[in-house]
Amino acid sequence: MCLIVFAWRPGHAQPLIVAANRDEFYARPSLPLAQWPEAPQVHAGRDLEAGGTWLGLGANGRFAALTNIRDPHRPPGRRSRGELVAGFLTKDVPIDDYLDDVVARAPEYGGFNLLIGNANEMWHFNARESEAVMLPPGIYGLSNAGLDTPWPKLLRAKAALGEVLDDPQPQSLLALLGDSQQAPFADLPDTGVGLATETLLSSVFIASQSYGTRASTALIVQADGSRHLVERSFGPFGGHLGEVDIRL
């Protein structure tokens, strides 16, 4: 997952609203959003190369999502970061205990941001800072850096999310995730990947021959605990592959 914007507002009619894009190489095998046969409490996509996932729902209102932190100068981790999301969704352990385990194991992974929560609390963990923070109500954004790093695409996506919060619908969340406008050269971050790649990665929705947005996900959680999750899948150059709509 490479871009997540979300509104966390406990006590509201919709306490959690999430719009997220997963960016990945098209050649990496994966499955779309579905109920997991071996863990029926989990609804998520699946990375078939390593077995984990990037965003999903579990029992008792559990939610988890992850973005990688871009740093080409650091070696890749020994373990797949997607197992951190899968682990939280498949296990029934308290959030504090799970975060303690994540903190202890973080050096085994490449850089990442992890969001985990339920109906009552939402936590963010940044592996570079090795600190877990309980989030107060607000509108937040994550890409391939720290929480709310003001990259152009994150600012655009957060602003677009704010405009639909009065009447959030999956289609409006998916629409904001389809923004393909690239940032001007002067506004690009420098993450060490070169100007051409920085430009490609600067849009909310990324499309190219080999790498791009593979899945766009909209999640709306209601105060009664019901959840509506919609995922669109894409192939090379942004070709639409399908859509999954799940109500829980």
Positions of predicted regions on the chain:
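N-terminal nucleophile
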Residues: 1-248
